[in-house]
């Protein structure tokens, strides 16, 4: 699959961002570039997954990158903010990717099944895991996109993750960026 859907998604983000503050305008180009790089690195890790939920999808660029680079996977963009969910639906139509959809909220009293969850700038590790326990069938793996190591190490302690199955992956970038993989069985 070509990179064309990613280019279309970026156009949609820039257009939508003129009227709605989806991404801080001063850092738009930097945030877009960073999200594409993060999505590409996650795609390398998640190549074998059939279903992925991008929780707190925001601009949707990480999810669009995943859908473009892993065309066999079903990608769900989890976003409860109505304005952002509207943007995501517009972006999906513009990219014409068949393997991606918006997931606004879980069905009542019913858990969803996905193999992997990605999240960036959503909630703390503990709060995210608590939420996922109530909405996703186990087993699943969560891939947290995190910044400074001292911050996420505190979150790991708070969530009592140090005794659980986890992996810290340094991202290929100049900034302090990490992927924290936690297997939730």
Task: List each language-model region with its residue ranges.
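A short acidic, Gly/Pro-enriched loop at the edge of an enzyme's catalytic core
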Residues: 109-116
């Amino acid at each position: 699959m070509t990179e064309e859907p990613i280019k279309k998604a970026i156009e949609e983000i820039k257009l939508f961002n003129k009227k709605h503050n989806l991404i801080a305008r001063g850092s738009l180009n930097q945030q877009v570039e960073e999200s594409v790089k993060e999505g590409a690195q996650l795609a390398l890790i998640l190549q074998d997954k059939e279903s992925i939920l991008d929780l707190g999808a925001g601009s949707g660029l990480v999810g669009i990158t995943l859908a473009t680079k892993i065309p066999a996977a079903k990608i769900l963009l989890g976003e409860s903010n109505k304005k952002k969910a509207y943007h995501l639906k517009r972006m999906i139509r513009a990219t014409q990717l068949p393997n991606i959809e918006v997931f606004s909220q879980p069905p009542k009293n019913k858990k969803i099944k996905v193999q992997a969850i990605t999240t960036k700038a959503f909630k703390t590790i503990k709060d995210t895991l608590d939420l996922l326990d109530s909405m996703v069938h186990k087993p699943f793996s969560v891939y947290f996109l995190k910044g400074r190591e001292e911050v996420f190490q505190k979150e790991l302690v708070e969530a009592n993750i140090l005794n659980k199955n986890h992996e810290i992956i340094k991202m290929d970038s100049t900034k302090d960026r990490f992927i924290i993989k936690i297997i939730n069985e």
